[in-house]
């Protein structure tokens, strides 16, 4: 069990990380650069 907002933030970060890893690598600038 943990603080709800902490868990929500942690899960959101995990989802964003998975989303970023699913995108092709790019050396560009802007939202597509990770």
From Swiss-Prot:
Pfam families found in the cross-reference section: Calc_CGRP_IAPP
GO MF term set: hormone activity
Residues the record lists as Phenylalanine amide modifications: 34
Transferase is among the record's keywords: no
Disulfide bonds: 2-7
Gene Ontology CC terms: extracellular region
Signal peptide per UniProt: none
Record's keyword terms, sorted: Amidation, Disulfide bond
KW Disulfide bond (keyword) present: yes
Name of this protein: Calcitonin-like peptide 2
Lineage of the organism: Eukaryota, Metazoa, Chordata, Craniata, Vertebrata
């Amino acid at each position: 069990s943990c603080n709800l907002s902490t868990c929500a933030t942690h899960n959101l970060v995990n989802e964003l990380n998975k989303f970023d890893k699913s995108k092709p690598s790019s050396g560009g600038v802007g939202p597509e650069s990770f």
